């Protein structure tokens, strides 16, 4: 009986720990996907393309699995919060940027939910992206 209990306990511990390793790996890969989309957005400097890159980064990260989707949400939320703080400092409580922030969050959610990020792709954006 003790041997059986020990085997069950060990299998549970190993099963849970392997899930954590998977989650952590997915989160790291998802964070990299988000960084790559941000880098591409900076490199492209293409007018009206930010929503596409938001959706693409979140989409790519979420495709990694639950860890990637979690990383995408955390990074997206942190970015929007920090942007709101800088808007308050720069413009005061004028509401400047609130609509853009909401549109960014909608694009983020669109991508995380598995919908095609090309929905936000502006005409003429180079195929490289």
Curated annotation (Swiss-Prot):
Residues 1-18 form the signal peptide. Residues 19-44 are annotated as: Important for amyloid formation. PROSITE patterns: SAA. GO terms for cellular component: high-density lipoprotein particle. One of its GO terms (molecular function) is heparin binding. It is linked to Reactive, secondary amyloidosis is characterized by the extracellular accumulation in various tissues of the SAA protein. These deposits are highly insoluble and resistant to proteolysis; they disrupt tissue structure and compromise function. Homohexamer; dimer of trimers. Can form amyloid fibrils after partial proteolysis; the native, undenatured protein does not form amyloid fibrils (in vitro). Apolipoprotein of the HDL complex. Binds to heparin. This is Serum amyloid A-1 protein. The lineage of its organism: Eukaryota, Metazoa, Chordata, Craniata, Vertebrata.
